[in-house]
Regions:
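Interfacial segments at transmembrane-helix termini and the short loops linking adjacent helices
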Residues: 42-46, 105-122, 313-342
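Signature of the first transmembrane helix
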Residues: 9-64, 89, 98-102, 125, ...
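Transmembrane helical elements of multi-pass membrane transporters/channels
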Residues: 14-29, 154-155, 159, 175-196, ...
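Hydrophobic alpha-helical transmembrane segments
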Residues: 49, 116-123, 149-199, 257, ...
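Membrane-interface junctions at transmembrane-helix termini in multi-pass inner-membrane proteins
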Residues: 8, 12, 69-78, 128-154, ...
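Membrane-water interface segments that mark the loop-to-transmembrane alpha-helix transition
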Residues: 10-26, 50-51, 56, 60-105, ...
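Helix-loop junctions and terminal segments of transmembrane helices
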Residues: 59-78, 141, 256, 260-285, ...
């Protein structure tokens, strides 16, 4: 399958380019994880997981998802306006979150049993996360895949280096969080100047800005809530587990996603960047992108099946050996979540057809149903105080959700 995707075309070259860079970038946090698990405790990982949950959910809200539309306009000027629109939204709502936290910080910290004001970093993390997504969308439109790779690599390595150094040289309970913010700042600054030069507007028109906000209103109306539901479906776990179980349990669960889902996320994201461009081109030209859909499906399945099968069989032994006996429990979670990881890997690029075909209402409905499944799983797991039952239900819900996405996106790949 991989031989069929050797660089015989721009599409194949782009996939190889992005996958190579993504493979290196995702390898860095995984490679340093055995070091971090011996520097930071599961509880500290749990607090970091809570921080990441808030910035992931927040970043999906603050741009109103207008950055997702940057690829779509045929006119370059309209895409430039969308960069400004999504950036203004991101700045405004990030500042709003900061003000709200300043007003209620004590209540917030007490509720989540956090001693230090570590969540002052959350609004900054949200803004950096959102701006970075906007900049990458523009770079993707310009097909600057090598620059995207370079930037991802710098962000990943910067965060990882800071996390190790902070833990060794100046052991603070929120070292993971501070390091994450610093790494994101570096990544944004490196790409920001080039993008600002490319998106300069000779005459800024408020009328046109409002017109484009209305033109792409489906994105805040449907894509934003769908994305929020999808992200919350996973990140809600890190918010609920510390309350009903412990921060230690949240930290163990977080390590599984760091090790298991990070490479899947990077590989899926890399292929998505190229697939969505090729899918748009094929749909415009042939009114169908089923051929490339099938090729990507088989490629992703072949990439994921064997590593995840190994995790399913020997998860506990692998985790205890690599990360230390203290993290053996995380290996059991990994065994349960491995099937979900495979479905997620396959679905993540292919489900972008919901956006390309502007079937955002349908996507929102599916995301809402999935969110309900997750909430029910959390209620049952927390009611019985059984973390294994909870993880099993979360895995099953995710498998069903991604299977539905795959089936529907396959149908969408064939024109109308």
């Amino acid at each position: 399958m991989i031989n069929k995707l050797k660089p015989k075309s721009d599409f194949s070259k782009n996939i190889v380019t992005l996958m190579t860079g993504s493979a290196i970038a995702q390898a860095i946090p995984i490679l340093i994880s055995p070091i971090l698990t011996r520097i930071y405790t599961p509880e500290e990982f749990g607090i970091f997981a809570l921080y990441m949950a808030f910035i992931s959910i927040g970043a999906s809200i603050v741009t109103a998802k207008y950055e997702t539309a940057i690829l779509l306009p045929k006119k370059e000027e309209n895409a430039k306006y969308l960069v400004y629109i999504s950036s203004i939204f991101a700045l405004f709502f990030s500042l709003l979150f900061f003000i709200v936290y300043m007003l209620f910080s004590d209540k917030f910290n007490n509720f989540f049993k956090v001693e230090n004001d570590v969540f002052y970093f959350v609004p900054f993390g949200i803004f950096l996360f959102a701006i970075y997504a906007i900049l990458l969308q523009w770079a993707n439109r310009k097909k600057e895949y090598k620059n995207m790779n370079k930037n991802r690599l710098i962000q990943s390595s910067s965060i990882s280096i800071f996390q190790v150094l902070t833990g060794i040289l100046n052991k603070i309970s929120f070292g993971l969080i501070v390091s994450d913010v610093m790494g994101r700042v570096i990544a944004v600054l490196l790409i920001l100047n080039r993008v600002l030069q490319q998106v300069k507007l000779e005459n800024f028109s408020l009328k046109k800005t409002i017109s484009l906000i209305k033109r792409y209103k489906k994105f805040p109306k449907y894509e934003m809530p769908a994305t929020v539901l999808n992200i919350t479906s996973y990140e809600l776990v890190y918010i609920i587990i510390p309350i009903y179980f412990s921060s230690v349990t949240a930290g163990l669960y977080f390590l599984v996603f760091r090790v298991l889902m990070t490479p899947i996320g990077f590989i899926g994201s890399a292929i998505t960047e190229v697939f969505k461009n090729r899918a748009i081109e094929d749909l415009n030209k042939y009114n169908s992108c089923r051929r490339i859909y099938k090729k990507i499906f088989l490629l992703l399945f072949s990439i994921g099946i064997f590593p995840l099968l190994i995790v399913t069989i020997w998860g506990q032994s692998i985790f205890s050996f690599i990360f230390g006996e203290e993290w053996k429990e995380a290996g059991l979670y990994a065994q349960i979540l491995a099937p979900l990881a495979l479905f997620r890997l396959i679905s993540s690029p292919l489900s972008y057809l919901f956006i390309i075909k502007e079937k955002l209402e349908l996507d929102l409905l599916i995301q809402f149903i999935f969110f309900i499944f997750i909430v029910i799983s959390l209620i049952i797991g927390c009611f019985y105080k059984d973390i294994y039952l909870l993880v099993s239900l979360l895995s099953l819900s995710g498998c069903i959700f991604y299977l539905i996405q795959i089936i529907i996106s396959f149908r969408l790949s064939n024109g109308n």
